[in-house]
Amino acid sequence: LWSRGLGDVYKRQAQMAQKYFDRCPWGDKITLMQGPALESLPKIKGPIDLSFIDADKVNYMNYYNHLVEITRPGGLIMLDNALWSGAVLDPVEESDHALARMNTLVFDDPRVHNLLLPVRDGVMVAQKKA
């Protein structure tokens, strides 16, 4: 199984992605969900091997908490924008605070090993423990 679900809240981007999936040799193994992730995520049944979150920052913790439950032991959850141009160090905006809380949550979560990659805007990687 290559992918259980990929999604985008924006219809136009979801349609564009679907065109590429249709041309891909593994396209029949990709399920594209169009709509808010908080509505789509409960439809994905585990276990999953890898997830990559790059969405509305204020819901990162909600996405993470759902995904860690359905990720197989050894599986990865990757969260984009973990450094947020340095704004997580001195948060001002709601998204700054949300990402700072998310980083703390992952760092303190006994269910995962974690690694913060200082690549571009930062990628937090959480590996579910066995």
Regions found by a protein language model. Name each.
Residues 29, 51, 111-113:
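Short active-site oxyanion
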Residues 1, 21-25, 39-43, 69, ...:
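Structural motif
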Residues 12-46:
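S-adenosyl-L-methionine
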Residues 46-53, 76:
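Short SAM/SAH-binding signature in class I
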Residues 1-10:
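Single conserved hydrophobic/aromatic residue that forms the stacking wall/gate
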Residues 59-130:
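C-terminal substrate-binding/active-site "lid" region of AdoMet-derived donor-dependent transferases
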Residues 35, 53-55:
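Cofactor-binding loops of NAD(P)H-dependent oxidoreductases
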Residues 11-12, 39, 58-59, 121:
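Short alpha-helical
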